[in-house]
Amino acid sequence: MAAKDVKFGNDARVKMLKGVNVLADAVKVTLGPKGRNVVLDKAYGAPTITKDGVSVAREIELEDKFENMGAQMVKEVASKANDAAGDGTTTATVLAQAIVNEGLKAVAAGMNPMDLKRGIDKAVVAVVEELKAISKPCETSKEIEQVGTISANSDETVGKLIAQAMEKVGKEGVITVEDGTGLDDALDVVEGMQFDRGYLSPYFINKPEAGTVELENPYIILVDKKISNIREILPVLEAVAKAGKPLLIVAEDIEGEALATLVVNTMRGIVKVAAVKAPGFGDRRKAMLQDIAILTAGTVISEEIGMELEKATLEELGQAKRVVITKDNTTIIDGIGDEAQIKARVAQIRQQIEDSTSDYDKEKLQERVAKLACGVAVIKVGAATEVAMKEKKDRVDDALHATRAAVEEGIVPGGGVALVRAASKVAATLTGDNEEQNVGIKLALRAMEAPLRQIVTNAGEEASVVARNVKDGNGNYGYNAGTEQYGDMLEMGILDPTKVTRSALQFAASIAGLMITTECMITDLPKEEKLDPAAAMGGMGGMGGMI
């Protein structure tokens, strides 16, 4: 086991604080409408330019191991805020730095760290309740646009795109961000249910100019097994041909003779048919087939429940107004499924989302909800260079998470005003069990001014003057650093999602409290490199001296 280096008391805290400040100082320059960029060196390729707090925090690793422990703990604040709300990482870092700095001053002055922590925790609980009280619902498209604009660093085009996307696919819909091909941002909306499986043979294509298969009012057969024998599906093909409608086959796979026969029948015009593989794998495939069945009022033909493909009838087939199949995707538009059954299925999947502990599973379940309920929107980010594209994608991603958070828990005045107002209200009534808890409460409430002060500092103004003016005001009155004007923050469109502000405060206070109560730090001693004796002698010089 490696030898350890141990530091106690003030020595440990001073080192830890230095690491906290290095990381937080790098992150906080990005805060606000006039925040600056940070350039991150990469081992390969061009450097990355970002204004995303968590991206900056993740890059920082310090040489001194004690300082690095402090930096890593603040990095955890940014990561947790990012995981919970997808935004507010810089605010969380600024709050953590302010609480740690104020708290360690009090500890150095002889205060009891545990009582200070209890005071900080009480202040945070009270302020969170106050934030919930001043929060208002985010319902209109205009408010969603404003939240998106602020989170994308005052980029109005991003705010507008997100608002349009939410309008098209609903607040529960899936909105994804992808690289665009041009200089401008674009929004693509996929209506109906789309899954990532394309046609099994290019011979099914009936729109050669677009390279797609389009079926109008088709029957849809859903099969939970491989089809390799054409005799299995022949009765269904004959019934569909008599009905004079096209057929879409969705199966685990269609192989050999069966696929060849389908292609020949399509090319001869005997029956209009297309085949695709079922989406997903294993249990997820079964669930998605059932989703399609409910959407199209069909039945999944599965041997597990004693059904045979040869005996399938038209009543067991689903139907839709239109199906479009490309090389990579299949889209089912306007399935004839019963609205009540679709809603029940959506409710069932939402319950699974609540019960799930895996982020990956939650994401996949959320996609299924969107496909059943509303559709999918894709924001394509345009930029002149790859570096600019990456930076913009980060901002769009932040804005997207912020708007979701705003829809979920509402909005509060932005620009750090909500925390200042909530802290002022709490300061008038909240007291601790002893004097040291009162100090903890006061230092936490004082630290809540830090985001406002940092936004103002980054805008090149005097933080103390602006903070005093804002505190003298009431309600939504605050300072717009973008225009350098005072006024009603909500009317000026400066909004923050309540969830983002709340999460930032809770995670910052939680980890700052742990750091304030730290008394000992332990790390590995650096290993001393032992010199190889032969290397030290410089080798034998090729034994040239022996000749």
UniProtKB/Swiss-Prot annotation:
Signal sequence, start to end: none
Gene3D superfamilies per record: GroEL (3.50.7.10), GroEL-like equatorial domain (1.10.560.10), TCP-1-like chaperonin intermediate domain (3.30.260.10)
Catalytic activity reported: ATP + H2O + a folded polypeptide = ADP + phosphate + an unfolded polypeptide
InterPro entries found in the cross-reference section: Chaperonin_Cpn60_CS, Cpn60/GroEL, Cpn60/GroEL/TCP-1, GroEL-like_apical_dom_sf, GROEL-like_equatorial_sf, TCP-1-like_intermed_sf
Any GO BP: protein refolding
Keyword Cytoplasm: yes
Functional note: Together with its co-chaperonin GroES, plays an essential role in assisting protein folding. The GroEL-GroES system forms a nano-cage that allows encapsulation of the non-native substrate proteins and provides a physical environment optimized to promote and accelerate protein folding.
Protein name: Chaperonin GroEL
Organism of provenance: Actinobacillus pleuropneumoniae serotype 5b (strain L20)
Organism lineage: Bacteria, Pseudomonadati, Pseudomonadota, Gammaproteobacteria, Pasteurellales
